[in-house]
Each structure stands twice: as structure tokens, then as C-alpha cells.
Amino acid sequence: MDKLTIISGCLFLAADIFAIASIANPDWINTGESAGALTVGLVRQCQTIHGRDRICIPPRLPPEWVTTLFFIIMGIISLTVTCGLLVASHWRREATKYARWIAFTGMILFCMAALIFPIGFYINEVGGQPYKLPNNTVVGSSYVLFVLSIFFTIVGLLFAGKVCLPG
């Protein structure tokens, strides 16, 4: 196993962890209002009213966000399989070829999720329009983690494909 394979494996693992964390954290969209802060996630929606304890419930997701969640979960599975194949490439060199294609599939799935997610900004909890959030609403830390997972997947693919050779 060469250094570039190890680097790409670490990048894919980081992307995998960031994607899992982005789903687990209910901060994809944050209203940040002082009276009642609302954070909307893909698996939980939390609200804090006037400094009381935070209350979290499962959200009713629009079809666009269900599709986004599906694509992210499939991307996570792809990256997990990729990491396994890169470990297996220590013994069977041809596993690297399959790992690259599966990682590429994961990148496509993540990019599709990133394109579809903003279509769901129209829901009542957010109050925006497709691809346009209201002025008082921002994307949260979970969305940033998800974008980082896309970035690490792309850079990992560059190293796995030996496109980004050092020196």
C-alpha cells in the first residue's frame, strides 16, 4: 500500500465521519431568533423557547429532504465500502480500482444531495423559497460539515487517482 492510498483512505474516512456527523446533528438550518431558536435537521428538529430546555422532535421532511437523506446515506455507505476496499488493497492490489469507482459514486451521491437539499427551503418551519432562505435564517454547522465531506471526498479521489502527485 503506497502513501497516496493511505492519504486517500484517511480523506475518505474523514469525509465519512463528517457526513455521519452532519446527519446526526440537527443544525442544517438555523433561525437563530432570540425568542425561539429553531434548528432543522434531516433526522431531528429542535427548538429553544425563551431560554428553556431544548426540545427535539422528528421532523416531517418534504420529499426533497427525504431524497437528500437517502443520497447522503448511500454516499456514506459508498465511502465506508471504499475505506474497506482500500484496507483490502494491502493484500489485493486490484481492490484499489474498485475503491476509486465506489468513491466516485459516493461523490456523485453527495453532490446530488447538495443540489436537491435547497429545493426544500419552502417548508413552513423555514419559510423560504426553493434555493432561497429568508433573511433571518442561515445554514447551520451540519450543512458546513456536509460540504466539508464533499470536499474531502473530491480531494481523496484526486489522491486515489494519483492526479495530485506531491513534489
Swiss-Prot record:
GO cellular component annotations of the record: ciliary membrane; Golgi apparatus
Transmembrane segments: none
Superkingdom, natural source: Eukaryota
Alphabetized InterPro entries for the sequence: Mosmo
Signal peptide positions on this chain: none
Listed name of the protein: Uncharacterized protein C16orf52 homolog A
Organism annotation: Xenopus laevis (African clawed frog)
One biological process term in Gene Ontology: negative regulation of smoothened signaling pathway
